[in-house]
């Protein structure tokens, strides 16, 4: 039987298999970019998880797909705009029905923009909030619906320095990240007693990416020489650590930074 892509905003990078009994646990990474998001996906795949990754342009998931499948892992890729409620609902439903029960979900979306308050248009502010906070709400809500009957699961949100303090020129980003952090705190207090671990990860430092290397070469080289840039794979290990925590000693927020970062 030939494979056909399904209409609408979601697509599969390969045919879905109807699975009656799924041994592998499912890890969902929403915002699976080339750096941290992909590192998180690889990290969970290495632990035997079936990885479901989503980003707005799912065609860009090819490298992650190849990385995981070359090591014998199972991978599914989607195109998804997490700001659109109907698409998020369909995305979570498709996973639960056709891949397996979601064991851990990571929301890793948030656009970092810098504009003075007078140059921050309502459109820029709203879009930044949609990406970081509203999408997190939509995903958190739909995943929680599935996890609650099982009394089990982990939901992790990626934060930033802006989650805990606002800086000059970052009114939109800080506002959105503060909202995401508050969402995570509220969900943790509500869902924790029901068996669902909710955590927020503050990334307080520059991540080692080609983008930073290209645009800020002097900064990059100085920090790199001092081991002062955050390795995406090392960050990802903390997400796995959060998932593995016993429920008698859960962490609901961690902050990660290089050893030389001022804070």
Where are the predicted features?
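Active-site loop of short-chain dehydrogenase/reductase
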Residues: 25, 74, 101-102, 116, ...
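Conserved glycine-rich cofactor-binding loop
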Residues: 33-35
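Conserved glycine-rich Rossmann-like NAD(P)H-binding loop of the short-chain dehydrogenase/reductase
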Residues: 49-63
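Rossmann-fold cofactor-recognition segment
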Residues: 70-85
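Substrate-binding pocket helix/loop in short-chain dehydrogenase/reductase
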Residues: 116-129
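Catalytic loop of short-chain dehydrogenase/reductase
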Residues: 154-179, 185, 189-193, 207
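C-terminal helical subdomain
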Residues: 196-202, 220-263
């Amino acid at each position: 039987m030939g494979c056909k892509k399904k209409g609408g905003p979601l697509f599969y990078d390969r045919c879905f298999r109807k699975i009656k009994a799924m041994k592998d646990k499912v890890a969902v990474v929403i915002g699976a970019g080339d750096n941290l998001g992909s590192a998180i996906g690889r990290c969970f795949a290495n632990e035997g998880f079936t990885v479901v990754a989503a980003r707005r342009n799912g065609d860009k998931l090819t490298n992650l797909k190849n990385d995981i499948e070359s090591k014998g892992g199972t991978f599914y890729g989607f195109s998804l705009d997490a700001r659109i409620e109907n698409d998020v609902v369909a995305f979570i439903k498709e996973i639960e029905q056709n891949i397996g029960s979601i064991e851990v979900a990571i929301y890793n979306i948030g656009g970092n923009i810098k504009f003075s308050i007078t140059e921050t248009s309502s459109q820029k502010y709203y879009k930044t909030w949609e990406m970081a906070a509203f999408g997190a709400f939509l995903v958190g809500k739909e995943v929680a619906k599935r996890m609650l009957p099982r009394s089990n699961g982990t939901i992790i949100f990626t934060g930033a320095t802006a989650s805990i303090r606002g800086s000059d020129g970052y009114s939109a980003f800080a506002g959105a990240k503060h909202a995401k952090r508050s969402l995570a705190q509220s969900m943790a207090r509500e869902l924790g007693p029901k068996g669902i671990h909710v955590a927020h990860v503050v990334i307080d430092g520059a991540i080692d990416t080609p983008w930073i290397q290209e645009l800020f070469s002097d900064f990059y080289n100085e920090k790199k020489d001092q081991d002062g840039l955050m390795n995406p794979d090392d960050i990802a290990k903390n997400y796995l650590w959060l998932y593995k925590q016993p429920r008698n000693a859960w962490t609901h927020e961690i902050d990660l930074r290089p050893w030389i970062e001022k804070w």
